[in-house]
Regions:
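Glycine-rich nucleotide/cofactor/substrate-binding loop typically near the N-terminus or early
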Residues: 37-108, 200
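C-terminal binding/interaction regions
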Residues: 318-341, 463-503
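N-terminal glycine-/serine-/threonine-rich phosphate-binding loop
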Residues: 1-55
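Cysteine/selenocysteine-centered motifs that mediate thiol-based redox chemistry or coordinate metal-sulfur cofactors
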Residues: 299-300, 306-315, 440-481
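Glycine- and Gly-Pro-enriched alpha-helical subdomains that act as flexible
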Residues: 271-291, 409, 413-461
Length: 505
């Protein structure tokens, strides 16, 4: 059903991008109704406007808190054109019908993020704008609602193609967008008022990105969010559901490291990681940790990729490479494979909470942001680790924190030697790690072990000592801690307890 735009109400906080739309509407003979600063802006472009006050016969009140909250405005928006009683009341009360509403809301979230005072934040809670958006969206059969700058381009395309005429499906599209904007806005306000109490959960995302499929080809997949806030994709195919999971795991892991570090991940677990003075050294030693699992993996570095490192990386088949930058020559090399995904990370990603849908609800927890240092490592055995061994324990504990439980990490000299992850038995996780280390020719004498949770029995201590490992880190907290400590003392193993468990499921 086609509708003609004859009168537009325009009240916006941001004026950018509005001039082109105004020019097209004016060309079609559309009358402009506006408020305050928006009216001044429109008139500065040479277009006449009707002030909202001329329709309401009331001035802007209460310091601008009340402008459009009036039957003369809301009635002109909500009146149903095909409804006989509505049209009789339009004539009776002398209402001016409004066919298009362009409005954006006060920048509430930006004001909160700026650290503004509570008084300033309260004043950025939009009342009139929300009412205009909801009213116009409710009456989408007759009215077009443009609720944000993000919708200007779509409206401009319609005006250029068809003039001041819109179709029902277009108006319904804008109405859906309007309720997305209003619900997101109200959720942001609720979260601010709720603070840290978490009395209810309101999650919103302004963008939905369809994926090729979900975790498996028979599952549908969608990403809700805006990846462009953090990444620029420089090359490669579209990101998949599994890519995104590995990217999340990779980014959260690498952010715990300060020295030049390279990590390789498969199925959310690190299969290679090393910190070195140069990035190419870090890459070579990360790959050496498990060159078989690295095939088809997700790679991440915390330093820009140079030409020399790119030449080495190019020898490996991989899905994704993430780095804070790429030298031009490095990009030329890495772009040789058309499907290889290259992501430039623009800024760190810090989340306070993580969420998982479960049992018809949502399970939420604070993100695990604990990073143990040597100061938190309490020696509980007769033999104490050396400073070098303590340094390696910190490295290993950072990795075990990001590994699926039950998890054991073996490390030496800032290099991941092997890991056992996702095991139902902790001793099996250690057996897996020892076997992998031997398979790739690593000498475990001088290596350290970090466990994501306590040892329920002393069997892991015995097995580690038999393999040549003489330094262990674990959280402690088992009723049998004394057994593990006694076994360590008997075998000459140094053990520290961190007091922090790192389960990850």
């Amino acid at each position: 059903m086609e509708k003609v735009i004859r009168r537009a109400l325009i009240s916006v906080f941001h004026k950018e991008g509005l001039a082109d739309i105004l020019a097209l509407l004016h060309k079609e003979g559309v009358e402009f109704v506006s408020t305050g600063g928006t009216s001044t802006f429109i008139e500065s472009l040479g277009y006449p406007t009707v002030a909202v006050e001329d329709l309401t016969r009331y001035p802007s009140m209460l310091g601008g808190r009340v402008k459009t909250l009036h039957p003369a405005i809301q009635g002109g928006i909500l009146a149903r054109r095909s409804h006989e009683v509505d049209q009789q009341e339009v004539k009776e009360y002398g209402l001016s019908l409004i066919d298009l509403v362009i409005v954006d809301l006060y920048p509430f979230e930006a004001t909160v993020a700026s650290g503004a005072s509570e008084e300033d934040i309260i004043e950025k809670i939009d009342i009139g704008g929300i009412s205009l958006i909801r009213g116009a969206a409710k009456n989408y059969e007759d009215v077009v609602i443009i609720p944000s700058q993000a919708d200007y381009a779509a409206l401009q395309s319609i005006l250029e193609y068809r003039g001041a005429k819109t179709m029902l499906e277009e108006r319904r599209h804008f109405a859906r967008r309007a309720f997305a904007v209003s619900s997101g806005y109200d959720s942001a306000i609720f979260r601010w008022f709720d603070g840290g109490e978490a009395t209810a959960l309101r999650l919103t995302a302004d963008q939905a990105q369809p994926l090729r499929y979900g975790e498996n080809p028979h599952q549908k997949g969608i990403f809700f969010g805006d990846l462009s806030r953090y990444f620029t994709q420089l090359h490669g195919k579209e990101l998949s559901y599994n890519n995104l999971q590995d990217i999340e795991a990779a980014v959260t892991l690498i952010q715990d490291f300060d020295a030049p570090t390279f990590a390789i991940l498969k199925h959310n677990n690190a299969c290679g990681c090393a910190s070195r003075p140069t990035l190419i050294e870090a890459w070579k030693d990360a790959l050496a940790g498990d060159p078989i699992s690295a095939f088809g993996g997700v790679l991440i570095a915390n330093r820009p990729i140079d030409k020399e490192t790119a030449q080495e990386i190019d020898k490996l088949f991989m899905e994704v490479l993430i780095a804070p930058g790429f030298a031009p020559e490095a990009l030329d090399i890495l772009k040789s494979k058309k499907n290889r995904i290259l992501l430039e990370q623009k800024s760190p990603i810090h989340s306070d909470w993580s969420y998982r849908s479960m049992l018809g609800g949502v399970l939420a927890q604070e993100c695990d942001q604990a990073v143990e240092t040597t100061a938190e490592m309490r020696c509980v055995t007769k033999v104490a680790p050396t400073d070098r061994e303590l340094h390696d324990l910190v490295f290993a504990t950072k990795l075990v924190k990001h590994s699926k439980s039950n998890a054991i990490v073996l490390a030496k000299g800032d290099q991941l030697i092997a890991s056992g992850v996702g095991q139902t038995s902790r001793v099996d996780a250690l057996k897996q790690a020892i076997e992998k280390a031997g398979h790739f020719g690593f000498d475990l004498h001088g290596a350290v072990l970090s466990s994501d949770a306590f040892f329920p029995f002393d069997d892991c201590v015995t097995l580690a000592a038999e393999a040549g490992i003489t330094v262990i880190a674990q959280p402690g907290g088992s009723v049998r801690d004394a057994d593990s400590i006694a076994a360590a003392d008997k075998l000459g193993v140094a053990m520290v307890m961190t007091g922090v468990r790192h389960f990850k499921h």
